[in-house]
Amino acid sequence: MLRSSIAPGRQLLSNPVRQRIPSQWLSRAGASNRLAGQVKRTISPSFLFLYTHNRHAQRFFADSKPPTTGGPTPVSPSSESSVPPETISKAAEQESKLPPSPPAAAPRKSGRFRRFLIYLILTSGFAYGGSIFLALKFDNFHDFFTEYIPYGEESVLYFEERDFYRRFPNALRHPNRLPAAPREEGKPVTIPSKSGLSWKVAEEQKADADSKKAEAAHEGQIKPAAAKPEERNAAVVKAKEDTASKHSTKEAKPESEAKSPVSLDEPRKPAVSASTIELLQLQDGDDTVVQDLVKTFNDIVTVISADENSNKYSAPVAKAKGELEKIAEKIAAIRSEARNTAQEELNKLHATFDESARELMRQFEEVRSTDLASFREEFEAEREKLALAYQQKVNTELRHAQELAEQRLQNELVEQAIELNRKYVHEVKSLVEREREGRLSKLTELTADVNELEKLTAGWSDVIDANLKTQQLQVALDAVRTVVERAETPRPFIRELVAVKELAAGDAVVEAAIASINPTAYQRGIPSTTQIFERFRRVASEVRKASLLPEDAGVASHAASLVLSKVMFKKDALSEGDDVESVLVRTENLLQQGDVDAAAREMNTLQGWAKILSKDWLGDVRKVLEVRQALEVIEAEARLQCLRVE
């Protein structure tokens, strides 16, 4: 399980981090302790004296030089001096007892593979645990995890069992203890004497007893679905009377039977027959499954009634009868609810289809108002075809319903014939098989009708989606036009243009129209017609001042042109000519009429300083015209797409 797979990972995670470093420290500490012990054991007093003497005799550069005295200098050894052998042996022993030099430290390993392995195990563990959590939360991921991941099913089962035991802690304490059934207080049942097993071999019973038992069993085996209500009531009344008479005779002669001696040679008397239990009858049990269940239950009741100890089964049989009646009522309620739900869904679908058809016709009438006369006949013909198709479909459904009702009645008659004529079972089975094949063929036809309806629904859905997309594109165009024409100041319309582009995704005409717009136009906005007209007035005054300037004018020419522009007479709007004043007057008149395109064309005919001064104004007007032209192209494309929908 999951524990067996996670335990090695935990050991790998715990061993290198928790055990390696202390072991290294302990090994190093042990080595240092051993080295210290060896040094302590090998250092002699003479070595300590020499070490301390040399340490005290050592002088650093920062220390002051000790003053030299006139003391005697040590005598240097001469070649003639002799060394005693005891000193040489002691020095050799001291040198041999010195500890060896510590080994060089091994190069430290980088541990990249170990870190990679640790990170890989951690990542795998977290991913596996997260996958188990997702498998417990989501059914789709549960199927994928348990089918394709190793040990996935065992892990999920383990955690599900833990969750179950956490929710139900008492489930393990009494796993086999069942809740005690309520004790039914019924009538006391008296078991007649000698009704059980005995040591004596059973002898042949009398012929009349056998005939009575066979007749009773045969009458009890008749099912309620085959017999009529009057016959079933008569059988029940007869069984009750026989039971009452048998009980009275049994109560009247208990003492005589007890006093009379039992003879082993005479044949045994047949057991007293028990009372007949009433068969189950359902008023609304027209379902095949319910009828089969009632037949099976009545067969069981008949067998129990034929037994001599049927009284002790009366209470459970009555309880089971009540449960079966409740089940039959629930099945009838569920069938009626399902039938009502299906009818409501069918009505909703019809209403939706009718509403969609009306909406589509209304849109077609709005778009094709100019061609209403030519297409009216086709529209009427299509509507008649649809009505005829719906009428044929309704007639087909009614015919199918009638055939199903007739088939149900025929099946009931066949079942009754089966119950009355058991010797023709084989022929009845063949008939049922043929009827089953007929049902399968009708199911195939119904499936074909459903597929055709799905295709029709998909077609209507495509038409509705296309019209909805066209309406959304038109709304987006209106939003862009509102931002462009009704804004008091130039506003960027990037979001509106992006919405138009997303709605017309895949349309080359719309994308080309949007690409033709200058980026600065939708990033900074474009002026409205009023702003263009106001700016034209300011530009016109500057152009009039420079209208008399030649191309190579100087300061004097500028001053003269400024003075003469004040005394120039304005011309009429209908005046013709290529001079600056005539062009400005015609442009102003066109702007007042709202014809920005013609006004821009007039201003574009200027030359020299007048054209240079009006260059910025012409650039803004060009951006406005580009945006308007693009919007007109997109709107025309949207209308064309709407006309293409069939």
Curated annotation (Swiss-Prot):
Q: How does it sit in the membrane?
A: Single-pass membrane protein
Single GO biological process annotation from the record: cristae formation
Which keywords does UniProt give here? Coiled coil, Membrane, Mitochondrion, Mitochondrion inner membrane, Transit peptide, Transmembrane, Transmembrane helix
Main localization (coarse): mitochondrion
Q: Which stretches are Mitochondrial matrix in the membrane topology?
A: 62-115
Which residues does the Swiss-Prot or TrEMBL entry list as transit peptide? Answer: 1-61
Highest taxon of the source?
Answer: Eukaryota
Q: Which residues form a coiled coil?
A: 317-455
Q: Which GO terms describe its cellular component?
A: MICOS complex
Q: Which residues lie on this side of the membrane: Mitochondrial intermembrane?
A: 137-646
Localization:
Mitochondrion inner membrane
Composition skew (Basic and acidic residues), residue ranges: 201-221, 228-258
Residue stretches of biased makeup (Low complexity): 66-87
Regions that span the bilayer: 116-136
Sorted alphabetically, which Pfam families does this protein's record hold? Answer: Mitofilin
The UniProt annotation puts the region (Disordered) at 61-108, 173-269
What does this gene product do? Component of the MICOS complex, a large protein complex of the mitochondrial inner membrane that plays crucial roles in the maintenance of crista junctions, inner membrane architecture, and formation of contact sites to the outer membrane. Plays a role in keeping cristae membranes connected to the inner boundary membrane. Also promotes protein import via the mitochondrial intermembrane space assembly (MIA) pathway.
What family does this chain come from, according to its entry? Belongs to the MICOS complex subunit Mic60 family.
Q: How does it assemble?
A: Component of the mitochondrial contact site and cristae organizing system (MICOS) complex.
Can you name this protein? Answer: MICOS complex subunit mic60
